[in-house]
């Protein structure tokens, strides 16, 4: 499936409506689970999860740099603390070790340079509601899969908002620009109405907006400050061409938030929900 990288404004079917300023309210909403029998296939296949230490504020992409600092410091300490004369072979070994340490330190910067742009860090929106809504008309196994998928997308990427639609049923998680005086059922229906108005259910090609910003944009369910948007359609694995089963949408407050590796990984997550 091809990916369209869009650097032009995206105009959905409904216009941007002015909204009043309000402070951030953080809460979670979820539909009541209907009692259904659980199957043995309830757990999400975690093979798509990426490695992380889980340390708040620690960027694992800079791990080679810290390793280089550590080994380089040990080599220098060993060199200056040696009491015996240093042989020529030891000097060559230390020079090679310092060269490898320097390369390890520079590796994260080289990686960003080769990508062609610097990926910014996400920031939480100043406005918006943090919500968690799952349709009640789906089975417990699919609910668990959707809950895990949205969690790992928020945890392992720069995403601040994720929406998954599977056969018309929704799972919405993260920060969204939604009303704050609605019940759980009303909030779910509100998101479903907005999705129908936007027309994302009819998208058949992967869309990526690395510079989703500006007043001309009108996707008003996203929080203010959204700068990147990625939409992955869920095309059914049938002989019928281009039969869409739903879509996966992620948004970030960082520009160029989703690299080729990120988009491939999100696509692997979407594979879990294809028909």
Swiss-Prot record:
Q: Where in the cell is it found?
A: Plastid, Chloroplast thylakoid membrane
Ranges per topology, Stromal: 20-65, 115-275
Transit peptide start-stop: 1-19
Which topology term describes how it sits in the membrane? Multi-pass membrane protein
Keyword Nucleotide-binding found: no
Q: What happens when the gene is disrupted?
A: High chlorophyll fluorescence phenotype due to an impaired photosynthetic electron flow. Seedling lethal when grown on soil. On agar plates supplied with sucrose, seedlings grow very slowly with a chlorotic phenotype. Deficiency in the accumulation of the subunits of the cytochrome b6f complex and lack of covalent heme binding to cytochrome b6.
Q: Which GO terms describe its cellular component?
A: chloroplast; chloroplast thylakoid membrane
Name one process (GO BP) from the record: cytochrome b6f complex assembly
- Transmembrane ranges, per UniProt, are 66-86, 94-114
Alphabetically sorted, this entry's keywords are: Chloroplast, Membrane, Plastid, Thylakoid, Transit peptide, Transmembrane, Transmembrane helix
The main location is plastid
Which PANTHER family has this protein been placed in? PROTEIN COFACTOR ASSEMBLY OF COMPLEX C SUBUNIT B CCB2, CHLOROPLASTIC
> What does this protein's UniProt record list under function?
Required for the biogenesis and accumulation of native cytochrome b6 in the thylakoid membrane. Controls the conversion of apocytochrome b6 to holocytochrome b6. Required for covalent binding of the c-type heme to cytochrome b6.
Question: Which protein is depicted?
Answer: Protein COFACTOR ASSEMBLY OF COMPLEX C SUBUNIT B CCB2, chloroplastic
| Phylogenetic classification of the source organism | Eukaryota, Viridiplantae, Streptophyta, Embryophyta, Tracheophyta
Query: What's the encoding gene here?
Result: CCB2
């Amino acid at each position: 499936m091809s990916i369209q990288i869009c650097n032009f404004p995206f105009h959905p079917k409904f216009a941007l409506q002015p909204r009043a300023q309000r402070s951030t309210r953080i809460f979670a909403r979820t539909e009541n689970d209907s009692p259904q029998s659980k199957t043995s296939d309830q757990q999400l296949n975690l093979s798509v999860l990426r490695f992380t230490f889980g340390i708040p504020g620690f960027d694992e992409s800079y791990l080679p740099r810290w390793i280089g600092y550590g080994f380089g410091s040990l080599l220098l300490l060993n060199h200056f603390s040696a009491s015996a004369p240093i042989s020529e072979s030891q000097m060559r070994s230390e020079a090679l070790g310092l060269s490898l340490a320097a390369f390890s330190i520079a590796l994260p910067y080289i990686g960003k340079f080769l990508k062609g742009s610097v990926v910014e860090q996400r920031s939480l929106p100043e406005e918006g509601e943090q919500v968690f809504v799952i349709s009640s008309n789906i089975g417990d196994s699919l609910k668990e899969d959707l809950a895990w998928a949205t969690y790992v997308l928020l945890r392992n990427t720069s995403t601040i908002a994720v929406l998954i639609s599977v056969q018309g049923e929704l799972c919405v998680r993260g920060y969204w620009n939604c009303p704050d005086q609605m019940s759980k059922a009303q909030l779910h229906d509100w998101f479903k109405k907005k999705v129908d108005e936007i027309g994302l259910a009819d998208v058949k090609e992967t869309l990526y907006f690395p510079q989703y910003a500006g007043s001309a944009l009108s996707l008003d369910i996203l929080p203010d400050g959204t700068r990147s948007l990625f939409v992955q359609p869920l095309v059914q694995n049938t002989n019928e061409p281009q039969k869409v089963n739903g879509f996966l949408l992620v948004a970030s407050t960082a520009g160029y938030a989703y690299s080729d590796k990120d988009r491939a990984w999100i696509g692997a997550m979407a594979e879990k929900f294809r028909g």
